[in-house]
Amino acid sequence: MNIHEYQGKEILRKYNVPVPRGIPAFSVEEALKAAETLGGPVWVVKAQIHAGGRGKGGGVKVAKSMDEVKTYASNILGMTLVTHQTGPEGKKVNRLLIEEGADIKKELYVSLVVDRVSQKVALMASSEGGMDIEEVAAHTPEKIHTLIVDPQIGLQDAEADDIARKIGVPDASVPQARQALQGLYKAFWETDASLAEINPLILTGDGKVIALDAKFNFDSNALFRHPEIVAYRDLDEEDANEIEASKFDLAYISLDGNIGCLVNGAGLAMATMDTIKLFGGEPANFLDVGGGATTEKVTEAFKLMLKNPGLKAILVNIFGGIMRCDVIAEGVIAASKAVSLSVPLVVRMKGTNEDLGKKMLADSGLPIIAADTMEEAAQKVVAAAAGK
């Protein structure tokens, strides 16, 4: 789950990480009121969407008068902001953050992620913060410093101080940087975040260390113990189909292809998509029905896939371990009839009650294309999607 910048800053504030004063706004009138409350002479009008690259996309503007606040708020609110993270379709801006201006002397970068190799937390920091951190990572990776933090110990004072000095924080400001780094780490750990990023973390002219931006991603599997994080959820920023899928406990992610995939198990789902691509096809979605699929869940899964106007074929790939193949067959038959399926359907089933499931499909009278192996299934669905 992702949240907005201003929400991330609320979290940072709770963990004693210095952030600028700011007020969210949902209208031009609220933006003007926020600017008046903050006082001038400089404000920053920032689009709030779940994507980076807002500055380059025209979603962040510095205003030096109330008239400029009004102009920028009017221009940004309601615009479709296209960045390198939104894709060409962009995201509509429904809210703003009006923030006090800052005296920026130096922009730094710091982030925390889970390092799967070490099974610990990786702290990454750079002296080259700001809008072009992707360029730094691509062309001068030596400027990015990485520290592996043992979660049983946490980020120690000496480690934080060392990282701060490596990214160019002057000695007089190192204690402030330590506070910011340790606060960010604590926020990351205690909220079950999968990513916590400050870009930029700035040094001001008078030596202060301030988080000028904040980005958090959270482990969705841990949200049950964080109602305060769930309260930040903005459904306008999420894919409508993914929201609908979550109501039926389906793991669904929209993709750009034309072949629908219905699979049980995330690993098998990814392998299925890889195999489709291997034979020249493009998956339209990731869809994991899990180990407890019912007729209702399978029907809803079909409905979700068929909402895609570009869908040309569907592949159902099931391994019957916990999930019995006859139950899936029953669901596929019922779903096909319920939605009046009009695209080719390829089904491959292996495992518990496999023969019974296959017989049910064969006797259903539906034009289902059977396959025995994953390779055969992928080849058949790619051909069907191409009209062959």
UniProtKB/Swiss-Prot annotation:
This is Succinate--CoA ligase [ADP-forming] subunit beta. It catalyses: succinate + ATP + CoA = succinyl-CoA + ADP + phosphate; GTP + succinate + CoA = succinyl-CoA + GDP + phosphate. It is an enzyme of class 6 (ligase). The keyword Metal-binding applies. Pfam families: ATP-grasp_2, Ligase_CoA. The gene is sucC. InterPro entries: ATP-grasp (IPR011761), ATP-grasp_succ-CoA_synth-type (IPR013650), ATP_grasp_subdomain_1 (IPR013815), Succ-CoA_synthase_bsu_CS (IPR017866), SUCC_ACL_C (IPR005811), Succ_CoA_ligase-like_bsu (IPR005809), Succinyl-CoA_synth-like (IPR016102). Heterotetramer of two alpha and two beta subunits. Residues 9-244 form the ATP-grasp domain. Its EC number is 6.2.1.5. Keywords: ATP-binding, Ligase, Magnesium, Metal-binding, Nucleotide-binding, Tricarboxylic acid cycle. Binds 1 Mg(2+) ion per subunit.
